[in-house]
Amino acid sequence: MPRPTTKQDLITAANDQFIKMWKLFDAMSEAEQNAAFNFGDTYNGKEAHWNRDENLRDVFGHLHEWHQLLLNWVRSNKSGVATPFLLAPYNWKSYGQMNVEFWEKHRATPLSAAIDMVKASHAEVMSLLEPLTNEELFTKGALPWTGTSTLGSYCVSATASHYEWAMKKMKAHRKTYAAE
């Protein structure tokens, strides 16, 4: 799927990927939905999240927290309070540790609550997009607080691209779960 470059493409991609993710989740048995990941050596040495996330709750908690990053960043900067996208003290070289903090934060969150949270935060992100223009979303420099990127790029990353990431993990989980 090509990366969205218009508001409508962004909304469509985010919602389409979100629906696909829930269809994949709903196709799993309850036992599979609640089972711990068992990726073994299949993904050993790849991205840190393969070792960090233990189950689907962790994936949904992660998605929710990245929605919150986007929502807080946009709301703060739009109201005139200069705020970086990532939480302090993190930067793009150290944000992996921030993801570990998110993981730790949701260790006691039940799967059902994580599902409710990510569905609610997705809806909030979609509402946030409504009043924005194509220029605000996809023109570099239109919003000075987006730096050398665009707001739309951050939105794609926190929605459609992240849902694709979640589906990749879900598919790997289905494969390893079926092999057990």
Residue ranges and their predicted role:
Residues 92-139:
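Acidic/histidine-rich alpha-helical segments that form the ligand environment
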Residues 1-2, 43-47, 98-106:
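A short small-residue
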Residues 27-46:
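Short secondary-structure junction/hinge motifs that connect adjacent elements
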